[in-house]
A protein has these predicted regions:
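Short, acidic, metal-binding catalytic loop of nucleotide-sugar glycosyltransferases
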Residues: 411-420
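Catalytic core of nucleotide-activated saccharide and alditol-phosphate transferases
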Residues: 176-261, 336, 340-344, 352, ...
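Boundary detector for helix-to-coil junctions that initiate low-complexity/charged tails
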Residues: 1-90
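Catalytic binding pocket for nucleotide-activated donors in carbohydrate/polymer assembly enzymes
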Residues: 205, 257-260, 264-362, 366, ...
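Nucleotide-sugar donor-binding catalytic core of glycosyltransferases
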Residues: 84-141, 213-297, 307-308, 313
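Conserved catalytic core of nucleotide-sugar-dependent glycosyltransferases
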Residues: 487-562
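C-terminal catalytic/acceptor-binding lobe
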Residues: 272-274, 345, 351-354, 528, ...
């Protein structure tokens, strides 16, 4: 009750200050208007019109006096100080926003005022609009912007950052600045969230946050991914330290492995960490979150300590674990586990697909943000907590021609691990059995008139048909369905797009100009280049058969063979072998078979 009264008082105080500013502006404008010559001339003319007898006689005299007064004012104006222009209240607020550095194009993302470490800032930047708060101007910036939430990471209190040691008695000014931000947010009805992603001074958790989340922001797949990883990785295992305290036993195990020559240490900065993981075959860590990031980059992880997680036992994300206790120092379990993981090599393509699917669906940064923001109450008129997931929405387009094709399409869509936002079909297919089945399942559906359903030479719809369907799609992505691809079809292509930032994803095909170039040069260099990437996934290529593309790109109606000439980034991702076969529990993982 006390916080609610404080919130209402703060809102009334802010409204009163705004009204006073507007009143002062109106009074200044009124005074300037009453003192203007134009108004006095108008009054003289009005008085003369009301009393024509006397008014017309006095009008020349009154106008002459105004003229003399105006001339005297202009002559003496040079020796007097010019009056300051009347400043608008809206102009004052726009100037404050400009000085705060927060002028920019608005978008559909949530607006978050952040006290964040550089790593957390880079992780959430693609999914929310971050307005960074600094200790020296936190109050000015926060008062000049409208935000949906306040997000504070404990890692921002690390040494060397702007908010270093916030919450510590030695940094009372920074703690007071952050406390003011949290209380001001509460007075507006804006939730404030603390991410306990690193050890922090205890006073930080005592601030009146709306929510304290134990953990980080998940795995940012746009940073930790296997995109363009070299086929040949370093074979020597590498140890990456965690942010928190590893423990005495874990540190001694690492020291023993390094002393025996089985392990090398690496301590890259947060910016170089993804490249280090992509270049490694085996990674030794003591943090489960770091193990997930290593496996998302294609490396095999050995986790020191931690209890098995039953939720990830069947997803390929169960790394080999070594218990961290006193017996591990004398049993040699760490060396044996490292030898097994090292012998297994990096993750296979099937294992990597399973890992990326699991991370994409459960622990990627947009999923974690939606979960965290969904646990607080937003102020009326704010954005949706699930706004970070909008960039994943996909519209599935297809051109079924008969009942057999439509039933195959319906079966493929209904078993997808990641449900589409909508389905876009040409008009006149409502009578097909598969379309009726999709409607009965409650999937949103759109139909488009005038779609050319004639197939091209390869038996698939042409670019004009896909473009007509994409023009009616409302999602940022369009999936082009041609044949059944399995339950993980949408998950795989959307995950690849999120990892790479590509404009289109699909199997690599020979570039349309490679044959001509080869015949002209006589050396087949272009054809050799196509063959080099034909069997590789998660690499950028010259041409693909698109399975997923940005809606704006498909709407242009271009042949996919020339998309790269128009600036599109094309990522190769072939179909997963045995897509319809369900993985057996424990079949794929980071622990090799004992036999």
């Amino acid at each position: 009750m006390k916080r609610r009264e404080q919130s209402q008082t703060e809102q009334l105080r802010q409204a009163l200050s705004e009204r006073e500013a507007q009143l002062q502006e109106a009074q200044a404008r009124l005074a300037a208007l009453e003192g203007s010559t134009s108004l006095q001339v108008g009054r003289a003319l009005t008085a003369a019109a009301k009393r024509p007898g006397r008014g017309l006689v006095r009008l020349p005299r009154d106008l002459f006096r105004l003229w003399r007064k105006s001339g005297t004012t202009r002559q003496s104006a040079g020796g007097r100080r010019k009056p300051q222009p009347v400043r608008s209240y809206d102009a004052e607020r726009q100037e404050a926003r400009l000085l705060a550095g927060n002028i920019g194009n608005r978008d559909d993302r949530l607006v978050v005022a952040g006290v964040l470490s550089p790593e957390v800032h880079a992780a959430i930047e693609p999914y929310v609009r971050v307005i960074a708060l600094r200790p020296q101007d936190a109050q000015v910036v926060f008062e000049s912007v409208d935000v949906d939430a306040v997000l504070v990471s404990a890692s921002a209190a690390a040494t060397g950052s702007l908010w270093a040691h916030v919450g510590d008695p030695s940094s009372g000014d920074r703690t007071r600045a952050l406390h003011w931000v949290v209380e001001a947010a509460a007075s507006r009805g804006v939730p404030s969230i603390l991410l306990n992603d690193a050890p922090a001074p205890p006073a930080l958790t005592t601030l009146p946050f709306s929510l304290v989340h134990d953990g980080g922001v998940g795995v940012p797949l746009h940073r930790f991914n296997p995109i363009a990883a070299e086929p040949e990785r370093r074979v020597d295992p590498v140890h990456l330290p965690s942010v928190g305290n590893s423990g005495v036993v874990a540190n001694r195990l690492v020291d023993m492995l390094v002393r025996d020559g089985d392990l090398r240490r690496a301590d890259p900065g947060w910016a170089e960490e993804p490249a280090t993981l992509r270049a490694a075959t085996t990674v030794v860590v003591d943090d489960p979150a770091l193990a997930d990031r290593a496996m998302a980059c294609g490396a095999r992880a050995l986790l020191l300590g931690g209890a098995p997680d039953g939720d990830t036992a069947d997803t390929g994300r169960t790394p080999d674990r070594v218990p961290v206790d006193a017996s591990a120092l004398s049993s040699g379990a760490a060396a044996e586990g490292l030898a097994r993981v090292r012998a297994a090599g990096p993750l296979s393509s099937e294992e990597l697909r399973l890992v990326l699917r699991s991370v994409f669906l459960t622990d990627a940064t947009p999923v974690r943000l939606a979960d965290i923001l969904g646990r607080v109450d937003f102020a009326p008129g704010s954005g949706s907590p699930s706004a970070s997931l909008r960039i994943r929405q996909v519209s599935v387009t297809a051109v079924p021609t008969d009942d057999i094709t439509s039933l195959a399409f319906a079966d493929d869509i209904l078993k997808q691990e990641y449900a589409p936002a909508e389905i876009v079909l040409p008009d006149g297919v409502d009578h097909l059995a598969g379309v009726a089945r999709l409607r009965s399942a409650g999937i949103p559906m759109r139909t488009v008139r005038g779609v050319d359903t004639n197939a091209d030479a390869g038996g698939a719809p042409g670019p004009a048909a896909w473009a007509a369907l994409a023009r009616e799609a409302t999602s940022p992505w369009v999936a082009l369905w041609r044949a059944p691809r399995g339950a993980a079809f949408l998950t795989d292509v959307l995950c690849a797009a999120e990892c790479s930032g590509a404009d289109a994803v699909g199997p690599a095909v020979p570039w349309w100009g490679s044959g001509a170039s080869a015949s002209a040069d006589g050396d087949g260099r272009a054809s050799a280049l196509d063959d080099a990437v034909a069997d590789q996934d998660y690499v950028f290529v010259s041409a693909i058969e698109p399975d997923l593309a940005r809606t704006e790109l498909v709407r242009r109606g271009l042949q996919p063979g020339v998309w790269n000439r128009h600036g599109a980034r094309l990522l190769a991702l072939g179909p997963q072998p045995d897509t319809d076969r369900e993985a057996e529990p424990g079949q794929v993982g980071s622990t090799p078979d004992a036999g």
